[in-house]
């Protein structure tokens, strides 16, 4: 936001999950300073009313995952034919990897790039202590073995 204001225009993204949620719910994809300021006010309101889990849940239930899939339920069903609660760690990494650029980083349009990005997600999960080394190795093997 600072870069955008100091350059008097829209130069960079870098939105938080809450800002992305605000944009999904209230605004279109128009890139303007006015939209970003409005988005910022909505973001503050969302963060005051909801906890992080609620914000993440709302975001994942509305986000675009590529190949016509809006929301984690649609994506899990379309890509893996399962409910989101049944996703494995590597399947979750595949879906999360699509969020950066869903039209380009999804299993249908770019399976090799999707696997590379999902591998980065698994590495990040390991470095943050969200999964153990054993889980990382197991899920990385399953990811590499998975036919996209």
Predicted segments with their positions:
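PIN/NYN-family metal-dependent endoribonuclease catalytic core
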Residues: 14
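Non-catalytic, structured segments within soluble enzyme domains
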Residues: 9, 17-19, 23-148
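Extracytoplasmic strand-loop-helix segments at the start of, or within, the mature domains
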Residues: 1-7
